[in-house]
């Protein structure tokens, strides 16, 4: 101990002079390394001084200062530790360096760029080490430069929820984009949340009537279930979703949330205008009577926004389910774009791609969204998801992964749309877990299976008809073909949302009337009516009236 005190007193003056010299330098520049820049004797003296001024471990006295709380850290968001600086920008990926470990944000935390012309929010994705985090930008990074200050907000992206969102259009951050003022609400929720616990889930099974004949009869939707609309480009997915929103809002009076994920801006605008015209959305003083909230992240948005806008829409729907106990409809157009956006983000983050170029986390990304869409004891979320099928290939990993989460599938067929039959729903490929006599009842189940049997027999006979012609068929087969063609045309239906294109008023068909109409067809009650009278009508009464009209026109 005496030797340490002597060395300490001898070298204190030398250390003080060195510190004074260093103090005059720029404090932001790092000190030169002794091993590279100092003379050997100075380096040795420095090590001796370090040894002399240090306390031996055996004689260390207990500190009188109070112990620091080692529990959960709380950030001083206005302080020095919460401010980082941009150190790298690669498209939608931004790296941010923080000064110390205390201000380092956790994964999924949102950061805000300071002194930027527009609001730019970043979401933390990776911790790279050396106090650097890699983030995903929720908007364009044009004009962003290195050195720009970034604030750690200390929370995930948080969006407004509640009835104030009805009739409004929001972006991924919950900001209004309909130019109708701010969304005034006291309720906000983070977009990253856990799925409901198993003990909170409900197990009841009930049909959600849509008023669309082919759906209600052959592939009925479960209230609180997940339904997938499969189809290629231009076969009518978005039109079918618009009709479902219209019918469910008018027939059930429930709230809907529409999440536009990576689709055309024009279609988003058309949907908004159509909702205003149909009364689903009301403006001005009657806005509180609106039945739908819209969340858009369209094709022109960066991949970060398209990858998170589905979660924003789901968060709005969850509030109506959990806080207000409502049965909510969540429409996602298009769930494939959600997968596609996550694939883009994955590539930008440098992950090795998986099958067909998709991200290796495809299943977990989709599961994080789908598992939150469920029915609890408080309320339900019934989700209808349009699913674009690349090159009409149902074995593509994106639609194939989605199949595992669905309770019903509505497959739109290009062959049926080419026949001019709309909605172009394939009655044989579309499926539903609800198609069971224990859930639907014997009458509905037998009618649905009877219709499918006739259509399947007609499909099996088409090759024979193409080669030999109708004359070579037996009388029973001729009757099967005639009924199948009538059923095929009777499955078509004019939509309310397509009135301005077709000129025909839309039809909502009650489930009971729907079942009785098709049972009458199977029983042969309408074998004498022409095929043309079954095309683009509602119930069977309209078929009879149309047949009489055609007969009068032919007689004249």
From Swiss-Prot:
InterPro entries tied to this protein: AAA+_ATPase, ATP-synt_VA_C, ATP_synt_F1_beta_sf, ATP_synth_F1_beta_su, ATP_synth_F1_bsu, ATPase_a/bsu_AS, ATPase_alpha/beta_chains, ATPase_F1/V1/A1_a/bsu_N
Biased composition (Low complexity): 1-20
Keywords carried by this UniProt record: ATP synthesis, ATP-binding, CF(1), Hydrogen ion transport, Ion transport, Membrane, Mitochondrion, Mitochondrion inner membrane, Nucleotide-binding, Phosphoprotein, Transit peptide, Translocase, Transport
SUBUNIT field: F-type ATPases have 2 components, CF(1) - the catalytic core - and CF(0) - the membrane proton channel. CF(1) has five subunits: alpha(3), beta(3), gamma(1), delta(1), epsilon(1). CF(0) has three main subunits: a, b and c.
HAMAP family assigned: ATP_synth_beta_bact
Protein family (similarity comment): Belongs to the ATPase alpha/beta chains family.
Name of this protein: ATP synthase subunit beta-1, mitochondrial
């Amino acid at each position: 101990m005496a030797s340490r005190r002597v060395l300490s007193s001898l070298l204190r003056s030398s250390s003080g002079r060195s510190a004074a010299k260093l103090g005059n330098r720029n404090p932001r520049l790092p000190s030169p390394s002794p091993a590279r820049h100092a003379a050997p004797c100075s380096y040795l003296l420095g090590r001796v001084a370090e040894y002399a001024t240090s306390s031996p471990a055996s004689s260390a006295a207990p500190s009188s200062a109070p112990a620091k709380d080692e529990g959960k850290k709380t950030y001083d968001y206005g302080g020095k530790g919460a401010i980082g600086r941009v150190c790298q920008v690669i498209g939608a990926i931004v790296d941010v360096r923080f000064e110390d470990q205390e201000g380092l944000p956790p994964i999924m935390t949102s950061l805000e760029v300071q002194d930027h012309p527009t609001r730019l929010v970043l979401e933390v994705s990776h911790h790279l080490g050396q106090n650097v985090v890699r983030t995903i930008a929720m908007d364009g990074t044009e004009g962003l430069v290195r050195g720009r200050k970034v604030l750690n907000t200390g929370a995930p992206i948080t969006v407004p929820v509640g009835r104030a969102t009805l009739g409004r259009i929001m972006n991924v951050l919950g900001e209004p984009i309909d130019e109708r003022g701010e969304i005034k609400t006291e309720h906000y929720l983070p977009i990253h949340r856990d799925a409901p616990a198993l003990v909170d889930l409900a197990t009841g099974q009930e049909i959600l009537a849509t008023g669309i004949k082919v759906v209600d009869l052959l592939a009925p939707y479960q209230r609180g279930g997940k339904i997938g609309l499969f189809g290629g480009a231009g076969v009518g997915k978005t039109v079918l979703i618009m009709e479902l929103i219209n019918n469910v809002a008018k027939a059930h009076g429930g709230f809907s949330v529409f999440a536009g994920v990576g689709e055309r801006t024009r279609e988003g605008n058309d949907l908004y205008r159509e909702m205003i015209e149909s009364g689903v959305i009301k403006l001005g003083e009657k806005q509180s009577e609106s039945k739908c909230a819209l969340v858009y992240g369209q094709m022109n948005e960066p991949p970060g926004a398209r990858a998170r806008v589905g979660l924003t829409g789901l968060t709005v729907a969850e509030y109506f389910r959990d806080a207000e106990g409502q049965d909510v409809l969540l429409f996602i157009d298009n769930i494939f774009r959600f997968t596609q956006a996550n694939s883009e983000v994955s590539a930008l983050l440098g992950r090795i791609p998986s099958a067909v170029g998709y991200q290796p986390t495809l299943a977990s990304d989709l599961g994080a969204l789908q598992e939150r869409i469920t029915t609890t004891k408080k309320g339900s979320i019934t989700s209808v998801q349009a699913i674009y099928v690349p090159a009409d290939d149902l074995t593509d990993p994106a639609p194939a992964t989605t199949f595992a989460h669905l309770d019903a599938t509505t497959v739109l067929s290009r062959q049926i749309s080419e026949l001019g039959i709309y909605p172009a729903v394939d009655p044989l490929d579309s499926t539903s877990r609800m198609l069971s006599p224990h859930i639907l009842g014997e009458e509905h189940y037998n009618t649905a299976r009877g219709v499918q049997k006739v259509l399947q027999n007609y499909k099996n006979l088409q090759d024979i008809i193409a080669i030999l012609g109708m004359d070579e068929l037996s009388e029973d087969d001729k009757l099967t073909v005639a009924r199948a063609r009538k059923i095929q045309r009777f499955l078509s239906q004019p939509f309310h949302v397509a009135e301005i294109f077709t000129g025909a008023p839309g039809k909502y068909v009650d489930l009971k009337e729907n079942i009785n109409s098709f049972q009458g067809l199977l029983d042969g009650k309408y074998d004498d009516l022409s095929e043309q009278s079954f095309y683009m009508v509602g119930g069977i009464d309209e078929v009879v009236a149309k047949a009489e009209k055609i007969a009068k026109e032919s007689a004249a």
